[in-house]
Amino acid sequence: NQFNGVLVDLACLSFGFKVVPIPLNSTPEHVSYIINHSGISHLFICGKIGKKIWGEVKNSHDIIAIDMSEMNTTSNYAMNWNSFISSSDTVEEFDVDRLLAKVDINDIQTVMYTSGTTANPKGITFDQINIISKRFARALALPDFNSEDIFLAYLPLFHTFGRYFEMLGSIFWGSSYCFAESPAFNSLLNDFKIIKPTIFISIPKRWLQIYEMLQIEMDLFSEDEKIIRKRLQQITGGNLKWGLSAAGFLDPGTFLFFQSKGINLLSGYGMTEATGGITMTPPDNYVHNSVGKALPGINLKLQNDGELCIKGPYVTKAYYKENNDKIFKKGWFHTEDIFEEKNGHYFIIDRKKDIYKNSRGQTIAPQKIENLFQDFDAIKSIFLVGDGKEFNSVLIYPDYENSPV
């Protein structure tokens, strides 16, 4: 995450240039696939990981690569950031009004690729209606967010919450958007003290770490309420009012703890295909184990088997260059997740999909890992588990007849 990257993203979104964020946790093979599949012509690169991956795949792609750092360019890149900015002086007849007039809000504006699956990544398409309508939906669900708020942002900009909720949301609300120095927990603790955010969106792991930090320092069941609240304010900078735990499971007791200490911690259910959130726990109305109620502007229905289907202005219309017949039926997107609904609140029961997310928000594909063990004679069957957990566990049933042990 860096300022120059945000500028590139916003410029492309504003002028109708198709923009494709590439997840930094992609393998070099998947990066090559995304470049070819999406038809990228210009690639903006920053950070050690991005540069390392580009170094491995650059010989396979005839595209213009731009180093977003402001150091001298190297042989790996056509130009660096300063050269790129200076090149604008040579552009003739650049007509802003003409470019804006050509933008069609129904055209594909951005493609976000999935990561962590067994096959090639899927490109999820969004037009400007998808992006803009989601901003109004979030504003209706969170009417108290405003220009006085400060986001401490560390979620990656190739992630829907980092890109749509934090980056575009802060612009919509007129709030301050502050980059975290690093996603590491100790670094975030330092950022809390410096930035003093009012809003913090995170994977469950970080909320749990804050809770455990307090738990180590004091007995949370017997300590005076004022002392606990004061220490929590010291850790989070003193101004934190709102939180969101996204992309994984967080125990209801942890939610209630933060809410009882003055931080309105919210949760929800979402997916990239819906520009992020689909449901959200209403402020001051948390129900145990619920992922909340439907966000404004989206239609939800449950199939006979409980599968959740969604439709609305901020739901993608298609996967890029894919056969969409199985997942889009009569205008409804099938999530492949099983739910129950009680009094408007939704509860996740099971997943039709094989993939799951751990407590760090990382997407895990069990089959891909399980297949790595197929050739071991000593293993008869294997099962990977870890949905919502901090770690993954492999359950192995040995083949006692063929095992040398």
Task: Identify the residue ranges that each predicted region occupies.
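Conserved ATP-binding/catalytic segment of the ANL
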Residues: 294, 298-303, 307-358, 363, ...
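Structural core segment of the AMP-binding/adenylate-forming
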Residues: 14-86
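Conserved AMP-binding/adenylate-forming
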Residues: 1-26, 154
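Conserved AMP-binding A3 loop
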Residues: 100, 109-135
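Conserved AMP-binding/adenylation subdomain of ANL enzymes
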Residues: 132-150, 157-231, 239, 264
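Short hydrophobic alpha-helices that are characteristic scaffold elements of the AMP-binding
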Residues: 9-15, 37, 159, 168-172, ...
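Gly/Ser/Thr-rich phosphate-binding loop
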Residues: 198-202, 210-286, 299, 380
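Flexible, low-complexity linker/hinge segments
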Residues: 74-108
